[in-house]
Curated annotation (Swiss-Prot):
PTM entry text: Glycosylated.
Temperature dependence comment: Optimum temperature is 4-65 degrees Celsius. Activity decreases rapidly at higher temperatures, nearly 40% of activity is retained at 100 degrees Celsius.
Organism field: Antheraea mylitta
Assembly behavior: Monomer.
Field pH dependence: Optimum pH is 4.5-9.0. High activity is also seen over the range pH 2.0-4.5. Activity decreases with increasing pH above pH 9.0.
Protein's UniProt name: Protease inhibitor
Any one GO molecular function term: serine-type endopeptidase inhibitor activity
Organ and tissue specificity: Stored in epidermis and secreted into the hemolymph and cuticle. Not detected in the interior of the epidermis, fat body cells or columnar or goblet cells of the midgut epithelium (at protein level).
Function per UniProt: Inhibits trypsin and chymotrypsin.
Record keywords, A-Z: Glycoprotein, Protease inhibitor, Serine protease inhibitor
Amino acid sequence: AEPLASQLKEPIAGGGWWAA
């Protein structure tokens, strides 16, 4: 849940693209 690739695998844990 750090790089973009991790956010694609675990977006909830990364709180990344979908939350933006």
